Design a protein with these regions (language model features):
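Conserved active-site neighborhood of the chymotrypsin/trypsin-like protease fold
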Residues: 34-35, 43-44, 51-140
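Small-residue-enriched segments and motifs
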Residues: 47, 88-90, 145, 183
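Bacterial N-terminal signal peptides that target proteins for export
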Residues: 1-9
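Cleaved targeting-peptide boundary
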Residues: 21-28
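N-terminal signal peptide c-region/cleavage motif recognized by signal peptidases
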Residues: 17-19
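Active-site region of chymotrypsin-like
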Residues: 29-42, 106-115, 141-222
Length: 222
């Protein structure tokens, strides 16, 4: 009887864990309002809301050198709309240029922000992942793919010659174009497992996201 009860409990846990997985549509609906548009002096990128106080995770290269930062929250709009009514001033709180991570904050955040959770679970190779961002001004666009590899202490540079960045990253098939940088890589629960960082110009299926392992360390560091 003990073993049967134990088996029944395990089956219940399995069913609950399976039912908590969201469809692609559900992941987008859960997470899209937790993704922001970040405007700097020289360009734009994506970010992920992680606190009710308006803290946002993004890439360092999205906010690098920007003296003026503004953040737009998700809204229903046409391309002809005046974006200014949706923008909030933001400031940089901390950065880690080596990991290409930044934490910024909306100075006067509105209420009821949709905060995204950061997962502490390392996703296995082959896991389906999701991304929301603003590739080439296609605002709040959704893409999906799979984790191909986890690369510890991966080195990369945005300029020819030299290595500027080192971090544990996920290699995924999820497309990352200009404007996607800084947005969240999400698991099937809609939780953050990485920050989308850059894609290969030579191969569309080689795209890289700084892992949540690095994000958690970054947030914990003083």
């Amino acid at each position: 009887m003990y073993n049967l009860n134990k088996l029944h409990l395990l089956l219940c846990i399995l069913i609950l864990s399976m039912s908590s997985l969201a469809s692609n549509e559900e992941v987008f609906e859960r997470a899209n309002t937790g993704v922001v548009l970040i405007m700097g002096d020289d360009g734009f990128g994506s970010g992920a809301l992680i606190s009710p106080q308006g803290h946002i995770l993004t890439n360092w290269h999205v906010v690098e050198g920007a003296e003026n930062l503004e953040v737009a929250l998700h809204h229903e709009y046409d391309l002809g709309d005046d974006f200014q009514e949706y923008f909030f001033e933001a400031k940089v709180i901390k950065v880690d240029s080596e990991k290409d991570l930044a934490l910024i904050k909306i100075i006067n955040p509105p209420k009821d922000l949709n905060v995204l959770r950061i997962s502490q679970v390392i996703p296995p190779i082959g896991s389906q992942v999701h991304a929301i961002g603003h590739p080439n001004t296609e605002f709040w666009s959704y893409t999906t793919g799979y984790i191909s590899q986890m690369k510890n202490q991966h080195e990369w540079s945005y300029e020819d010659g030299g290595i500027d960045h080192v971090a544990t990253v996920y290699l995924t098939q999820t497309p990352i174009d200009e404007g996607n940088s800084g947005g969240p890589l999400l698991n099937e629960h809609g939780n953050i497992i990485g920050i989308n960082t850059f894609g290969s110009k030579e191969a569309s299926f080689q795209n890289y996201s700084v892992s949540a392992i690095e994000v958690i360390r970054f947030l914990a560091a003083r």
